[in-house]
Design a protein with these regions (language model features):
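Bacterial Sec-dependent N-terminal signal peptides
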Residues: 1-24, 445
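N-terminal leader/targeting segments
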Residues: 5-13, 71-73, 433-435
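A subset of solvent-exposed loop/turn segments in beta-rich extracellular surface proteins, enriched
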Residues: 23-250, 289-318, 416-420, 438, ...
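A generic alpha-helix preference that emphasizes hydrophobic side chains
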Residues: 10, 16-17, 134, 403, ...
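Outer-membrane beta-barrel porins/channels
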Residues: 167-445
Length: 445
C-alpha cells in the first residue's frame, strides 16, 4: 500500500509544537482584583468606608495606588478534546514508540470531529499614570496553532491505509491554522463616569509576521484502490504557507500588519464586570505559496515522499510541490491578508469575605475547533499578600480542566505568580487531555 500517512500528518502536524491556550493572571488577585474587604466592624461606625452583606458589615481597605508598573511573562498550553496527555508526551516530547494500546486509547476517544490547540506567549510591558489616564506600551510574542481532524485521519496516520483498501476514508472536517507573530503596541486606559467606576481602554499594535500555515477544506476524502495502485483525493481545499524550509521559533519576517485590543469594566465596592476583545487585526503576508483544488485528483506515484520537514513541524516545500504537481495542481505565489486569532472574554468577580473571592467567565477564540470556554475560580487569601486560585473550566480546545494559580507579593512592590495546569498530566495522563503553565514577574512603583 502507498504511504499516505505523511499527507495527513501534513494536514494536522502544524500543531506539533511544545507549548492552552488562554490564562488569567493570578497576580491580578493581589493588585487589580485585590480583595479589599477587612475585619467585621460595628455597622454604626461611619468613619470607615464599608460594605454590607446580609449578615455582616466589612470595612474596605484603601485601594492600592501606584504610578507605574513593569511586567514580564511567559506561557505555554496545549489542549485537545480527544488526544490524551500520555499520547502527547510520546508523540510530541519524547518521540518514543507509540504502541497499539496507546493508539487504541486514542481511537476509543475519537469523535467525528476532534480538535487540538497550542498557544505559546511571552512578552514584557509597562504602564504609567498621567492624572486619570494610564499609558501602556509593550512587546509580545505569540505562536498559535489549532486544528480539526476526523477519526479516519488519525487512523490513516498511525495505522496506514491498508484497512481502507477499496474504501474511502473521510477526512472531513480538516482545518489547520498556525501563525507566529510579534507585536509592538501602545495603549491607554481611562476611568470615566460620575462615580468614577467605569474603565475604558484600547491598544494599537504593529505586527511583525513570522510564519503562516493554513489549510481549509470541505468534503475531504481519500480513496485507496483495492490493489493499492493509486490514491484518489476528493475535496475542495486551499493550502497556503510561507516558505519556511527550516523551523525557527522566531522566523524571518514574512509580513506585517496591525492589531488592536479593547477593554471595558464597571466596578462596584466588591465586584467588577469586564469585557475584553483581544487581537483584532490582520497580517499582510508576502509571497505565500498557495495550492487550491475543487474536484477529484489521482496520485499514481510509487510512494509519497515525506512532506514534513525533519523536525516534524513545518512543511518541506520541495516534496510538497512534487506531491501536488504530480496530481496536476499548480501552485500560485501571491500576497494575502488574513485576520489574527481574536478572543472575546467576559468575566465577573466578587469578594465574598476577607479571605475568599470568586470569579467566573466565558472566553471565545474565533478559530476552528474552539468552543466557548466557561470557567469558575476561587481565590483564597492565606494572607493579604499570598493567594491561591484553584479553577475549573470546560471548553476551549479541550473538555474539563483543573488549574491552580499562585501569587505572592513582597513589600507591596514585587509580584511573582504562576498558573499550573499539570495535575491531570501527572495524576491520570492516559485519561485526560491538556497541560501547560504560565509565569510572571511584576514590579509596581
Amino acid at each position: 500500500m502507498k504511504k499516505i500517512s505523511s499527507i495527513v500528518v501534513f494536514l494536522s502536524s502544524f500543531v506539533s509544537v511544545l507549548g492552552q491556550v488562554d490564562f488569567d493572571r493570578p497576580e491580578a488577585f493581589l493588585f487589580e482584583r485585590k480583595n479589599r474587604l477587612s475585619e467585621v466592624i460595628d455597622s454604626t461606625d461611619t468613619v470607615l468606608e464599608t460594605v454590607s452583606t446580609k449578615n455582616k458589615t466589612f470595612s474596605l481597605q484603601k485601594e492600592t495606588d501606584y504610578k507605574s508598573y513593569f511586567s514580564v511573562y511567559g506561557s505555554g498550553y496545549i489542549n485537545s478534546n480527544a488526544l490524551t496527555n500520555s499520547f502527547m508526551k510520546s508523540y510530541l516530547y519524547t518521540n518514543s514508540y507509540i504502541d497499539d494500546n496507546l493508539k487504541q486509547q486514542q481511537v476509543d476517544r475519537l469523535k467525528k470531529s476532534n480538535s487540538i490547540g497550542v498557544d505559546i506567549k511571552a512578552g514584557l510591558y509597562g504602564q504609567h499614570k498621567f492624572n486619570k489616564i494610564r499609558v501602556e506600551a509593550g512587546l509580545s510574542y505569540r505562536d498559535f496553532s489549532s486544528a480539526q481532524f476526523s477519526s479516519d485521519a488519525f487512523k490513516l496516520i498511525f495505522y496506514g491505509n491498508s484497512m481502507y483498501s477499496g474504501q474511502t476514508a473521510s477526512l472531513d472536517p480538516m482545518s489547520v491554522y498556525n501563525v507566529n507573530y510579534q507585536t509592538l503596541y501602545m495603549g491607554v486606559k481611562k476611568i470615566v463616569g460620575k462615580k468614577q467606576n467605569v474603565t475604558l481602554g484600547a491598544r494599537l499594535g504593529f505586527v511583525r509576521g513570522g510564519r503562516f500555515q493554513k489549510v481549509d477544506s470541505k468534503n475531504l476524502s481519500l480513496y485507496t484502490a483495492t490493489d493499492g495502485s493509486y490514491l484518489r483525493l476528493n475535496a475542495k481545499f486551499d493550502v497556503a504557507y510561507t516558505n519556511d524550509s527550516i523551523y525557527s521559533a522566531v522566523p524571518t519576517m514574512n509580513g506585517g500588519g496591525l492589531t488592536s485590543d479593547y477593554f471595558f469594566s464597571i466596578k462596584g465596592k466588591r465586584s467588577v464586570f469586564a469585557i475584553e476583545l483581544l487581537d483584532v487585526g490582520y497580517i499582510r503576508w508576502n509571497n505565500v505559496t498557495t495550492y487550491s483544488g475543487d474536484g477529484s485528483y489521482r496520485y499514481d506515484g510509487i510512494e509519497i515522499a515525506n512532506i514534513i520537514g525533519g523536525n516534524g513541524i513545518i512543511l518541506d516545500p520541495i516534496n510538497l510541490s512534487t506531491f501536488f504537481e504530480s496530481m496536476g495542481i499548480n501552485k500560485t505565489v501571491k500576497d494575502v491578508t488574513y485576520m489574527l486569532p481574536s478572543t472575546l472574554h467576559i468575566s465577573y468577580y466578587r469578594h465574598l469575605t476577607p479571605k475568599v473571592s470568586v470569579t467566573g467567565g466565558v472566553r471565545q477564540q474565533f478559530v476552528h475547533g474552539y468552543i466557548p470556554k466557561v470557567y469558575g475560580k476561587l481565590a483564597y487569601y492565606l494572607t493579604k499578600d499570598f493567594v491561591l486560585v484553584p479553577s475549573l473550566s470546560y471548553g476551549g480546545f479541550g473538555k474539563a480542566d483543573i488549574e491552580l494559580g499562585i501569587a505572592k507579593s513582597f513589600s507591596n512592590h514585587v509580584l511573582i505568580s504562576t498558573n499550573l495546569m499539570w495535575f491531570e498530566y501527572v495524576a491520570a495522563p492516559s485519561k485526560t487531555s491538556g497541560h501547560g503553565m504560565s509565569v510572571a514577574f511584576s514590579y509596581y512603583f
